[in-house]
Each structure stands twice: as C-alpha cells, then as structure tokens.
C-alpha cells in the first residue's frame, strides 16, 4: 500500500546518524519503496532522495519518524494539514507514540508495507484567544508564569461555570497526553480510543479540587483574573510560552483534523503501559 516513504528525524541531531539508522534505511530500501527526506534535514544517505518540503508532502504516502515522542510531535506539527499517516520508530526514551523498536524494525516494516497495519486517529486540541490559535496533540497548559505562585481564574464548560479557584495553572489533556505531562501532574491514564479530555488543576489551593473527565466535544473556557506577573502564560505540547493578558478568555476545543498514527496490527496499549511505566505481570514483582 505504501510505496513512497518519507523519513523524519529530529533536526540537527547528529546522534541519530549512526549505524542503527543507516541499517534501517537499507532495510527499508530492500522493500522496494521510494525513500524521501525533506531538504531541511541534516541527514543524508545514498538511498534517500532529498526533496523540497512541497515535493515531500506531495510524494509520500507515509512518514516514518525516527526518534522519541517529542520528534513525532514535531513531525505532526509540520505535516498535520496534509493528513499523511505517521509511523514512529523509538530511538528515544519512553516512546508511547513511537512503538516500533529498533531491533524489531526489519520484521515490523515488512509487515506494515504488506498491509498488516492499523491506523489510529488521535484527537488534537486547540486553544484560541485574542488573535492567537494554537493546537497540540498532548495538552494545553495555562499557568501563572512563576514558580510556586498562584493565579486566580474561572473555568467554564459549555457556558456553565464549573468553579473559580486559585492554582499554579490548569492542564487540559487529550488521551494521548494522559501518558505525558498530565500523568506527571497526577492525572489518570486515558485509553486512546476514548473521546474525552482530562481537566487537571496544577497544585490547587483547595484540597477538594480534583481532576475530572469530560467529553472532548465540550467547549472549555477559562478566564484569568490575576496572577503574580504582568501576564499569565499558555503552552501547548511543551512549546514556547505565550503571554495571556488578564481578563482574556481562552477557548479550548477539539480540532476537526486528527493525527493518523500507523501501528502494527498486534499493537497493544496495555503492553506499552507495562513496558513504559514498569507495570508487572506478576504481583510478587510489584
């Protein structure tokens, strides 16, 4: 099914230009596919055609990302509008999204190129305020912009007031993001097939404040009244903070587009949780 394969690497990461990566490119070429890479990449190989960004998105049927989850997030931001399926090969650390292992690449890629794969569509979250429009795969984080200092805000869902409170900030996480920053902040793990968001206060002043789950079709709004600095901050998927003036209302919604992730047919989310989070199959090992 896939005859024209694009590859994507973390920019300026010379550490990925190693024997393992070169061997995977050679294995890919043996599958009788055309291999392309965007000219903005620093990686070069005789078996890979270097093309412009416009040629890249026009030619490729699938993008294979070599790296960790952060690299896959970067590729999603660059190519989301073209709706090209993405396959992740884990050359990073945890790697919930990059589920192909380097030592299993040859077997996995042959199966996928023969049609033994499934495509999973992951929801994306958008945040709008003033003239800004941000989007991400993992989460929207709105915070005070100062370490261990609170801001006061009011939260709305579908035009109804949920609460007004003080906290370091608020995380709105997708199921994909539930195994990322939101997990570190005490949020629940959400199966990626569920169409929900997690709303998670960051170090709230009220001890009764807890994370809660809502439909991803809900309209979430947040109005910030005051904080320790001249502005509050918003950050999406760990990108650079953007200033939010006090009194501004931020609208958080599900995007119409989805990210299409390619997995082997035997991909198992719970196996990934066991492996990445150290869960045990034997209670005596816990």
Q: PLM features: residue spans?
A:
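Gly/Ser-rich helix-loop-strand patches that form or flank binding pockets
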Residues: 79-89, 96
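Redox-cofactor binding/interface segments in oxidoreductases and associated redox assembly factors
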Residues: 7, 65, 172
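Catalytic core of DAGKc-family lipid kinases
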Residues: 16, 94-168
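Short glycine/serine/threonine-rich phosphate/pyrophosphate-binding segments
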Residues: 17, 71-75, 179-184
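Gly/Ser/Thr-rich active-site loops/lids in small-molecule metabolic enzymes
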Residues: 164-167, 172-208
């Amino acid at each position: 099914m896939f005859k024209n394969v694009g590859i994507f690497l973390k920019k300026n990461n010379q550490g990925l230009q190693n024997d393992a990566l070169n061997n995977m490119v050679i294995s890919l070429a043996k599958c009788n596919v055309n291999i392309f890479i965007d000219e903005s990449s620093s990686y070069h190989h005789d078996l890979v055609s270097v093309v412009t960004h416009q040629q890249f998105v026009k030619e490729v049927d699938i993008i294979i990302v070599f790296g960790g989850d952060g690299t896959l997030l970067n590729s999603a931001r660059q190519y989301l509008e073209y709706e090209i399926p993405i396959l992740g090969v884990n050359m990073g650390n945890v790697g919930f999204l990059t589920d192909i292992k380097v030592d299993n690449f040859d077997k996995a890629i042959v199966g996928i190129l023969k049609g033994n794969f499934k495509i999973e569509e992951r929801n994306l979250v958008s945040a709008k305020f003033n003239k800004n429009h941000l989007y991400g795969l993992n989460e929207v984080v709105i915070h005070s912009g100062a370490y261990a200092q609170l801001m006061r805000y009011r939260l709305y869902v579908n035009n109804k007031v949920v609460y007004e409170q003080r906290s370091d900030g608020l995380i709105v996480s997708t199921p994909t993001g539930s195994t990322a920053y939101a997990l570190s902040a005490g949020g629940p793990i959400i199966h990626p097939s569920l169409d929900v968001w997690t709303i998670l206060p960051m170090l709230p002043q009220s001890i009764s404040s807890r994370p809660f789950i809502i439909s991803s079709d809900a309209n979430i709004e947040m109005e910030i009244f005051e904080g320790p600095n001249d502005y509050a901050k918003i950050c999406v998927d760990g990108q650079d903070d953007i200033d939010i003036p006090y009194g501004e209302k931020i609208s958080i919604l599900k995007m119409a587009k989805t990210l299409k992730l390619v997995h082997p047919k035997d991909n198992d989310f719970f196996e990934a949780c066991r492996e990445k989070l150290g869960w045990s199959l034997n209670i005596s090992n816990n």
